[in-house]
Design a protein with these regions (language model features):
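A charged, well-structured terminal subsegment
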Residues: 114, 120-130
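Glycine-rich phosphate-binding loops at beta-strand->alpha-helix junctions
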Residues: 55-77
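Active-site proximal loops enriched in glycine and acidic residues that flank catalytic Cys/His/Asp
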Residues: 22, 33, 58-63, 89, ...
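Flexible, glycine/charged-enriched surface loops at secondary-structure junctions
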Residues: 8-13, 47-55, 85-91
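Conserved phosphate-binding/catalytic loops in two-lobed NTP-binding clefts
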Residues: 72-116
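Adenine-nucleotide phosphate-binding core of ATP-dependent small-molecule kinases
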Residues: 4-8, 15-50
Length: 130
């Protein structure tokens, strides 16, 4: 009940609340945010290595779609893998599919909007029709 973001930050299990507290100077919240972003970055790197490279990285869902700070931290220092994002595009993504790739980067980086309610409705319909 008090693990993960809440356990480390002492603030909340919601990353938005943790980021707000970190921005206000809460060191535990900053640590929690840094640890989560590091774990995401480590996982992305592991998958890139396992696949022998990638053509694109997609950020979607709650954090991926709405957290420019997380996207920036995950992609930071990944230039050597061909990943570099445009700061302005990252901070202000436009449309359901937004390419935030920086000019000259070899790997495309996209932010794609999700419609979780639609997915739940489709899955429910599929189950009911079986």
């Amino acid at each position: 009940k008090k693990s993960g973001l809440l356990g480390i930050s002492g603030v909340s299990s919601d990353k938005r609340d943790v980021e707000e507290a970190a921005a206000a100077g809460n060191k535990r919240a900053q640590l929690a945010s840094d640890m989560l972003n590091y774990q995401i970055k480590k996982t992305v790197g592991a998958y890139i290595a396992a696949m022998g490279g990638v053509d694109a990285i997609v950020f979607t869902g709650g954090i991926g779609e709405h957290d420019a700070i997380a996207r920036a931290k995950v992609c930071h220092h990944m230039d050597w893998l061909g990943i570099r994002i445009d700061t302005e595009k990252n901070e202000h993504p436009v449309g359901d599919v937004c390419d935030i790739t920086a000019w000259g980067a070899k790997v495309r980086t996209l932010v794609i909007a999700t419609d979780e309610e639609l997915m739940i409705a489709r899955d429910t319909k599929e189950v009911v029709e079986k």
